[in-house]
Curated annotation (Swiss-Prot):
Biological or metabolic pathway of the protein: Porphyrin-containing compound metabolism; protoporphyrin-IX biosynthesis; coproporphyrinogen-III from 5-aminolevulinate: step 4/4
Positions bound to substrate: 25-29, 74, 151, 206, 325
Record keywords, A-Z: Cytoplasm, Decarboxylase, Lyase, Porphyrin biosynthesis
Protein localization: Cytoplasm
Keyword Cytoplasm: yes
Gene from which this protein is expressed: hemE
Protein name: Uroporphyrinogen decarboxylase
Amino acid sequence: MLKNDLFLRALKRQPCSRTPIWVMRQAGRYLPEYRAVREKTDFLTLCKTPELAAEVTIQPVDLMGVDAAIIFSDILVINEAMGMNVEIIETKGIKLSPVIRSKADIDKLIVPDIDEKLGYVMDALRLTKKELDNRVPLIGFSGAAWTLFTYAVEGGGSKNYAFAKKMMYREPQMAHLLLGKISETISAYLLKQVEAGADAIQIFDSWASALSEDDYREFALPYIKQNVQAVKAKYPDIPVIVFSKDCNTILSDIADTGCDAMGLGWGIDIAKARAELKDRVALQGNLDPTVLYGTPEKIKSEAAKVLKQFGQHTESSGHVFNLGHGILPDVDPANLKLLVEFVKEESARYH
């Protein structure tokens, strides 16, 4: 039995004594303890070494007191498992090769055997689960098909997604072929993560806001829905969070995927999101990550604002406090600790 199941209870919209908190990228460069591990190895080797991945996954639980751990990995492990070469240089960016721009390129990609190609993630999950010793839940995750598609077609990050959109608009069937292949891999990967011990799943659609509403409905949401339904069909009790960054105008469409919770960027008042969705799903978020550069007073007042905007809890509401995106690498860890402690204390009044 979990000693602290607040995170899972909030996702399932069950009564909680306070609002749980974790933050995206909580295992990362802002922590000196993470940097000490990272100095010894490169980023992808860290992801692929279960002992090290488990160590950095647990650091923020020990040091910051967050209510959930998220397995240390990267969304691009799927692209690599499908046959692409992935280079991640933390300060310089990301390079994938060969780029995928034709039917022949797509045909060369495999739908991998997850245990064979991504077994190291499952090993890290099992080890982390054991070392956490039921203190807090463990989150497994994947990138969404659209985001992984953009990396495959662009060969890295992009300002305007020209190659990805060219495929969408000129050869939509080919785009769907690639998206479908990626989505099939994501679904299998998520199921294996639950099998290995993940208590909840988050799907990250980091580049969601690059698409218009209609394009998002056509090229992104159907695949997210496939992934959510794959998890729900086999593991109905495992909560799934969808983080479609800054898709604030189509919240109800995202809720229609069948997810339990929705991650919000900081560009929307959480009160508006709650009013629109009427507690159909739990909400996660949504403090601007740069608030953590602020004074202690400012951090507290901005966090208090998010809690107040979400408002009083009912029997069917759920809120997980988080940032609207990942914590930035140059934030003072003391500021995150202050935020975590403040949210734990301040949120009780709304429950």
